[in-house]
Amino acid sequence: KTESMLGAWGYATVTDDNTSFNNWWELSWSSKEEADAGWQEWLGSEEGSAWGEKYSSVLQCDGENREGYDFIFPYNPYAFGDTPDDGSFSASFSACTLKEGKSQEDLSNVLIQYNSWLDNIDPSQTSGFYAYGIYFPDDATAEEDFWFANFHENLETMSEGNSLWQETGGDAKIQMEAVSTCSAPEISNGQVFFDPSDPDFS
């Protein structure tokens, strides 16, 4: 099913949140149907079984409780350049809920304002790759309405980007905070495992 897999990434958390797990594995597929079929194929394959056995001392994955999301890049993910050649990056994920009376349309409008802020950033104030994405949970009973994810070249450029947002976000920041409430971010170092468009990772 690799032809329908859009990418795979690993995340090693650097946030001390006292949870029972310390890493994330993300698989992106062309559809939920393809994701479910691919997962079942992996579980039933000798290759998958052998891989799990070989690396059992390295990681234990909670596959039964995996979560599904619809993902979008609301802004060109390469507007600030390409990701590092070695596939490394840093990421922050915040669980967000829409405030009372706010809707998906309000979220869309505030993302337009955020995109406008990104458009007007002085290039001299930034360094390295940056992109952001929104994850909408498939589970209708999920506590969060969406996850807001920021992807940076490394932890240093993440800190620089956060400071720039705090200092110059202005009305876009005010409006975003008026639409949703987001948790403290879960911060990780990430790594590309599979990218069908890059021979080094496919």
Report the location of each language-model feature.
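Short S/T/G/P-rich N-terminal loop/turn motif that feeds into the first structured element of a domain
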Residues: 1-202
